[in-house]
């Protein structure tokens, strides 16, 4: 095996519970991420050859592999996140399936199976080594596969000084899954020409377009009276919430959109006759379409208040991140390099928009163009998550190829 420590490194990482917590007020949101960075990652960063390794109060573990050839003038960064998504991450027991036969994979004793009839992506991996869950937790390949791949690439470069490269900066950060990990990222400290998040899915993914994103919070104020005498007096806040939602386009929902189509997504609805609350996320790719979606919500709220004769609908909109294409398309160098490297490795680049966001969405707007590379995970964020060891190895190949690339 070209990278003999990759599998064991990955298994070590995923067994540590680093689930983030969106209700927390601390950074990182969970102490487990701090402990993972300080007790697991930082010692290993030093072991694999990174220098000037340190932990920042923003939750990022940072390190540098110095250039070994002055003709490589670009400084390149690689970033992955430590936290895992909002699914059980306690006592993760990964299964290693060698030489996958293409059939059904029982997930431990859970009664759940990875079945190609349900997950057609499995057909691509016959004969490969797969790492799965035992059916009771997620796996955490999102994004501990990325961390393991970056760490392994650095280890390989340190052991092979004949591979010439420029300065490499590495950052492992918190809370990507709850959308705040990059909020406090120190771009000035990281100091690279461009970077890559290693946080994508299947082999070949290369992404530089994300949604632009906003959150919408609505409060509906009702008036509760006895239902027996409610005529022309009661205002049902729950009905107001329903009325608001019904005025959004029925086709513009996550379950009915794909590709470059945006949406409104009702995330939470709660309340009583007296008061109700609704939370939405708003997503689109183009700036004009994104702004139009937010404006449409304002128009609906204003119209309802006008019809009701009082301010019973309150809307608060907050932008979360923007499509990093706006930054990256100004200089496509990181895309051209990654694409050329993949093609040299006989990897077919898959350049498609991310129907979501990455840490790179925010970091790009901090002045460091940061597209996203594949890390290998499939079915992420749940019990059916799995990753191919061979795809992880190819990700390591790609990282090494990028840093050693000369125009």
Curated annotation (Swiss-Prot):
GO terms for biological process: peptide catabolic process; proteolysis. Binds 2 Zn(2+) ions per subunit. It is found in: Cytoplasm. GO terms for molecular function: metallopeptidase activity; tripeptide aminopeptidase activity; zinc ion binding. Zn(2+) 2 binds at residues 142, 177, 381. NCBIfam families: peptidase-T (TIGR01882), PRK05469.1 (NF003976), PRK13381.1 (NF009920). Cleaves the N-terminal amino acid of tripeptides. This is Peptidase T.
């Amino acid at each position: 095996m070209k990278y003999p420590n990759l599998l064991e490194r990955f298994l070590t990482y995923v067994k540590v519970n680093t689930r983030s917590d969106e209700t927390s007020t601390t950074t990182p949101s969970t102490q487990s991420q701090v402990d993972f960075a300080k007790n697991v990652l930082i010692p290993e960063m030093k072991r694999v050859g990174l220098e000037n390794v340190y932990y920042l109060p923003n939750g990022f573990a940072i390190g540098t592999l110095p250039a070994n050839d002055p003709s490589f003038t670009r400084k390149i960064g690689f970033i992955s996140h430590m936290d895992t998504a909002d699914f059980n991450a306690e006592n993760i027991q990964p299964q290693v399936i060698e030489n996958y036969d293409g059939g059904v994979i029982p997930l431990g004793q859970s009664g759940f199976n990875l079945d190609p009839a349900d997950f057609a992506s499995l057909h691509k991996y016959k004969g490969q080594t797969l790492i799965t869950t035992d059916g009771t937790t997620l796996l955490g390949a999102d994004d501990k596969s990325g961390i393991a791949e970056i760490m392994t690439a650095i280890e390989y470069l340190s052991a092979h000084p004949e591979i010439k490269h420029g300065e490499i900066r590495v950052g492992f950060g918190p809370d990507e899954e709850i959308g705040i990990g990059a909020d406090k990222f120190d771009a000035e400290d990281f100091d690279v020409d461009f970077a890559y998040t290693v946080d994508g899915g299947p082999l070949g993914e290369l992404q530089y377009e994300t949604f632009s994103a906003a959150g919408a919070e609505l409060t509906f104020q009702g008036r509760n009276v006895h239902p027996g005498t409610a005529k022309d007096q009661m205002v049902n806040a729950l009905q107001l919430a329903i009325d608001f939602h019904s005025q959004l386009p029925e086709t513009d929902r996550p379950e009915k959109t794909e590709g470059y189509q945006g949406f409104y997504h009702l995330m939470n609805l709660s309340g009583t006759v007296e008061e109700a609350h609704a939370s939405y996320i708003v997503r689109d790719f183009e700036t004009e379409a994104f702004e139009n979606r937010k404006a449409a919500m304002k128009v609906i709220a204003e119209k309802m208040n006008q019809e009701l004769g009082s301010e019973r609908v309150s809307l608060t909109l907050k932008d979360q991140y923007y499509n990093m294409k706006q930054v990256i398309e100004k200089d496509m160098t990181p895309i051209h390099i990654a694409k050329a490297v993949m093609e040299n490795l006989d990897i077919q680049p898959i350049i498609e928009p991310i129907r979501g966001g990455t840490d790179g969405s925010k970091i790009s707007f901090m002045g460091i163009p940061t597209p996203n590379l594949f890390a290998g995970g499939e079915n992420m964020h749940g019990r059916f998550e799995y990753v191919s060891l061979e795809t992880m190895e190819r990700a390591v190949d790609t990282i090494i190829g990028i840093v050693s690339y000369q125009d």
